[in-house]
Amino acid sequence: MKTIMLVDDSATILLSISNILAKAGYATEKAANAEEALRKLGTGLKLDLLITDLNMPGMNGIDLIKEVRKLAAYKFVPILFLTTESQQSRKLEAKAAGASGWIVKPATAHEVLNTIKLVVR
């Protein structure tokens, strides 16, 4: 079973996306912010994909990606953004930081799962 970490400051989004993923057969690990995600990753969690919000209180998603990419165990783990932003400049910034893709909220279950299938093999 593939494990996906979800990072979002919205409990509603975390619940909604984790339900979609569970129904599709994925295990999920949830974090309410970037700092919590980094703490969990520090425990050596086996991870196949990280999905993060871009705009969160404290450390934002771009800074989270930069920190994750410094961790040897997660250097090549795919990372997707799930965010309300759709500006091309932000997408380029995310790609430069190491993001593998982008999902614009609100997204349907179909959009989420198809995007995941493109980056998780």
Q: What is the meaning of each model-derived region?
A:
Residues 46-48, 73-78:
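His-Asp phosphorelay/catalytic-motif detector in bacterial-type signaling
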Residues 53, 83:
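Active-site residues of response regulator receiver
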